[in-house]
Each structure stands twice: as structure tokens, then as C-alpha cells.
Amino acid sequence: MSAIVDIIGREILDSRGNPTVECDVLLESGTMGRAAVPSGASTGSREAIELRDGEAGRYGGKGVLKAVEHINTEISEAIMGLDASEQAFLDKTLLELDGTDNKSRLGANAMLAVSMAVAKAAAEEAGLPLYRYFGGSGAMQLPVPMMNIVNGGAHANNSLDIQEFMIVPVSQPTFREALRCGAEVFHALKKILGDRGMSTAVGDEGGFAPNFGSNDECLSTILQAIEKAGYRAGEDVLLALDCAASEFYHDGKYQLAGEGLQLSSAEFTDYLATLADKFPIVSIEDGMHEGDWDGWKLLTERLGKKVQLVGDDLFVTNTRILKEGIEKGIANSILIKINQIGTLTETFAAIEMAKRARYTAVISHRSGETEDSTIADIAVGLNAGQIKTGSLSRSDRISKYNQLLRIEEDLGDIASYPGKSAFYNLR
């Protein structure tokens, strides 16, 4: 038995300089697992609650000492002595201890840190790489990366309303070559922006954050960068968007302040359809407000057969909400953010539910990240097929890409890179 003998929670800083939670779990054998949790900027209203201290004079109220205290007291007492290899039972214990629907008592940040650290300790105890511990012998597929090379919206201080403009390398034979492609396009874009006298400063997720005149201009410039790097847009590299539409939905309208537009759900559907016709866009995330299910239905009926429509704020990694979306034919993909739900067991359940319905599952970082690379192992372990973990700069993003390189090397000849087939939800 891999008995838990010690648990230590601590407050550390994330990539934005805000506090977050880290946890160490020590097993009887001396094996240790360590995990740190991320934090989002644009968040869905139905996400599990991230417990913050609210003490204005300390970190602007964003301290996490309460969550850390929960780890070091209540949670520690509840799971001490449990078998670390019994992940589902451990997560069930955490859920029962919290006792709320949204993890507001203990905090999803406290619960997730423990859930992840236990899994890491158990994998180490078993002598298995984390991805293999998660997925067994079937874990062999690397994910297609959606690389956020231009940041807008809540992730940057510029005039772009759409939050993320991403490149998606799909023609390469390996993840290593796909990563190289992304890096070369990133550097080509930097050169283009520099030549135009535009900012090459980067946003929260490592992408550039210049002031483009429109979303159209931004996408056109990315196409130029793809070609400048020696690749073919629409063949080697596709595009993806994260609208984060809940962030600019006010008074029943989608208000694109950067373009001076106020659009109804039907008009915004037309707007996105026009972009998808003009550019090789394979995926659109949060194309409607999380509560605008009628708008989501319109968007799905219009674009759902040729564009991946990802629900992030819409589904918040929650199987109850995802089940309702599947039944109503809303979207065709779910974004998986481990801190939206708060335990690994619930995260894996959402991925499996999506797959059974032929929805894709895109494993995702948050805008506030750490060096923790667990999501890379989840992406491979669960054969998710797609990952979103930022641009080709900032070590908090690169740590996930580098872990995927190590995993691909470890898998050797059995490693596969799905390319366009990762989008099995499109017909």
C-alpha cells in the first residue's frame, strides 16, 4: 500500500505574480509528489471556486493562505494514511469533505493541488511516467498544439476583442516537427511586426499583443508569417480562435469595441462564419456567451460540421453541463481545464463523456500558470489529441511543450501525431 504519511501546502506565485497553491504529498516509501495549480483571467461563472483570502492589504486580496491552511489541517487529517494509488477514492473523500456543489468551502485550488500531488506520488511509487500512470499501455498519442501567438481580450492590453489567435500545425509527422513549425512561425511573425514598427511585447500566454486595426488584419498577418516561415496556410498550418465571447457580451449584444460593432447572436454567427470562409479556421472556442444557448445552437447549426466549436466557459469541465450540451446539440468539443472542476477524477470523467459523444476534448492551460506540466501528461495519458498551452515564449508555457517532447522521446516508435485526424468531430 502506498500510504500517505505527510502533506504540505504552501503559497507560491504564478506567471502573473499572483499567489497560487502548491502541495507536496509524501508516501511511506519516501516517494514524493508535488503539484501547483493554475489560475484563469477570463473565467466561466459556473467554474469551481478558487479560494482567495480577500485581504486587501496583502497581494491585493489574492492571497491563498486560507486554501493552504485547509490543506495543512482538514484535508491532511482526512487523507492521511490513505492509499495514494486509489485516486478515485481519494478524490471522493475530498469532495465529501468539502460538501458544496462548487468547492467553495475548501477551495478548488486546495483540492486540485492535493489531487494532482497524490497522483504524481503514486506514479513515482509505481515506477511509471505520469502519462503512463494515467493512461496505461494505450497512452501513445501526442496532442496537436493550438499555439496562441497573438493575444487580445482579457489576456492583453490592446484593441483586439478576440482573446486568442492560434496556429495549429497539422501536416507534420511528429510532435517535435509540429513544435518546430510553431516556433518558426512565431519568429517569422515577430520579424513582420518589428518591420512594421508594431509592438513585439507578449501577453499573459506568451503571444504578441500588438494593436491591429481589426481581427481580419490580425489573421491576414498570421497567414503572412506562416508563408514567411516556409509553410502552407490551410495545409501545413491551420488557424484557431478563442473569442471568449462572454467577455464582450453586454445587454444582449456582442460588442466588438475594437471594430465599433454591436451584434446580435445571429449577426455574430454571420461574423464568425465570414471569418471561417475567408481564413483556414479549424476551431473556434467560446464563440457565444456562456448563457446564450440559443446563440450556441445557431452557431453549431451553421458551422458545426466544418469548424470545431469548443465550449470553455460554456461547459467549465463539468459533466452535468456537458451532458446537457450534448443532448441539445450544442458545440462539438469541450475545453478541459483541471482547475475549473478541481479533481483529476472529475476531469477524466469529462474527457471520457466527450469522447463517447464524439466531441473532442482539448486539454488547456490557464493564463496564470506555473512550471507544473501535468496537463502535458494528461493530454497523452488520456489520448486527448489536442492541447492548448500558449505561445512559443515564456517558460511557464514552454515547460508543457518540453514535457511533451520528453514523452514523445520516451514512447519512441509507438508515438503517434494525429494531425488533422485530431478533429474527428468534423464531418
Curated annotation (Swiss-Prot):
The EC number(s) attached to this protein equal 4.2.1.11
Q: GO CC annotations?
A: cell surface; extracellular region; phosphopyruvate hydratase complex
Which residues of this protein are catalytic? E205 (proton donor), K337 (proton acceptor)
State where it is primarily located.
cytoplasm
GO biological process terms held by the UniProt record: glycolytic process
> Per its Swiss-Prot or TrEMBL entry, what cofactor is needed?
Mg(2+)
Name a GO molecular-function annotation: phosphopyruvate hydratase activity
| Pfam families, alphabetized | Enolase_C, Enolase_N
Could you tell me which pathway this protein works in? Carbohydrate degradation; glycolysis; pyruvate from D-glyceraldehyde 3-phosphate: step 4/5
Record family assignment? Belongs to the enolase family.
Question: Top-level EC class, please?
Answer: lyase
Q: Where does (2R)-2-phosphoglycerate bind?
A: Q163, K337, R366, S367, K388
The organism sits in which domain of life? Bacteria
Q: Which InterPro entries match?
A: Enolase, Enolase-like_C_sf, Enolase-like_N, Enolase_C, Enolase_CS, Enolase_N
Q: Which organism is it from?
A: Burkholderia mallei (strain ATCC 23344)
Q: How is the cofactor bound?
A: Binds a second Mg(2+) ion via substrate during catalysis.
Q: What is this protein called?
A: Enolase
The answer to whether the entry has keyword Cytoplasm is yes
Question: Can you say where in the cell this protein is located?
Answer: Cytoplasm; Secreted; Cell surface
What are the alphabetically sorted keywords of the record? Cytoplasm, Glycolysis, Lyase, Magnesium, Metal-binding, Secreted
